[in-house]
Amino acid sequence: MSKRDYYEVLGVHRNASETEIKKAYRKLAIKYHPDKNAGDKAAEDKFKEISEAYSILSDTQQRVIYDQYGHAGLNGGGGGGGSYSSGGFGGTPFEDLFGDIFGDIFGGRGSQRSRGRRGDDLRYNLSINFEEAAFGLETKIQIPRHQTCGTCDGIGAKPGTTPRVCPTCQGAGQVRVQQGYFSLTRPCPECNGEGQIIDQPCEECHGSGRVRGKRTLSLKIPAGVETGSRLKLSSEGEPGLNGGPPGDLYVVISVQDHPLFQRDGQHVICEIPISFPQAALGCELEVPTLTEKVNVKVTPGTQSGKVIKLQGQGFPSLQGYARGDQLVVLRVEVPTSLTDRQKELLEEFAKEGGEEIHPMGKTFFDKVKELFG
């Protein structure tokens, strides 16, 4: 069975604002919530359907994908250097719904959320390579987000008209009601907590004062970042509502693995294989670093695991301190196959050093016979 259109599920048009989508979701979620419809399977299925629709349409990036590709687009994967999400680092549709309800009960919160509200924080995941993390880079990123409507300058009203003060709450956005012994503050039902009423909404933004768009930002990544490093761009998140301040943008770094190097704090680790003759006799190796190749001397008699330090060839700290070092770890490789001549030479080498050779010529059963007679 094919899924219904998410906009149809919530009962909103495809150009609905974030506020309109949230309002529709809250209304339906309260109506079909399982706690209110115990044992009603149809209500439970309806609640799941509207929750799924809201989880997609309330997420800026997911909504863009859905608008362009429909349900099929949400099942695919993405690629590229960056990904985007809205709403900062927490928050769910259920928190929005029940946070508003409890805010209504205890008073005050409904007005704070609806009048002069701060815009949502945004998160952008940026993938960079190992060298870029070591030396920093300047790049551009494109963020899908809402922008102030250019037709109505963010007012939400049709050009040439202005919103009027709500006659019920006198612009306060909330009303006080008496329930038993309690005096409760609720969002004004006349203006939905906005404090004003728009009789002729702007046709471009449908009264929200915001339109969907994209913003290109120049970004400077400092040298020394690592996976999980977070850069904050103040006021580059979603614009606020009703004159509220914009949110912030957080760029979260992910550093790609390198085929040769590993990172340990400020140090770079590089394992270099050498042969037994090179280790025994000494040699000179050409070793790669983050910037160039350098020559390294291996002293005679070098053991596997020896570390050679290349000073200043590592990562800087984010505080601007000196760079760490590159640690070259030498790994002596033992040959897995030998020619007859090579075997003879090694046997001579061992005898010359007074070592006794025990070739693995005897089978397991030969050893058993010798042991038990």
Swiss-Prot record:
Its cofactor is Zn(2+). CDD domains: DnaJ (cd06257), DnaJ_C (cd10747), DnaJ_zf (cd10719). CXXCXGXG motif repeats lie at residues 149-156, 166-173, 188-195, 202-209. GO terms for biological process: chaperone cofactor-dependent protein refolding; DNA replication; protein refolding; response to heat. It is found in: Cytoplasm. A zinc finger (CR-type) spans 136-214. Participates actively in the response to hyperosmotic and heat shock by preventing the aggregation of stress-denatured proteins and by disaggregating proteins, also in an autonomous, DnaK-independent fashion. Unfolded proteins bind initially to DnaJ; upon interaction with the DnaJ-bound protein, DnaK hydrolyzes its bound ATP, resulting in the formation of a stable complex. GrpE releases ADP from DnaK; ATP binding to DnaK triggers the release of the substrate protein, thus completing the reaction cycle. NCBIfam families: DnaJ_bact, PRK10767.1. This is Chaperone protein DnaJ. It comes from Syntrophotalea carbinolica (strain DSM 2380 / NBRC 103641 / GraBd1). The gene is dnaJ.
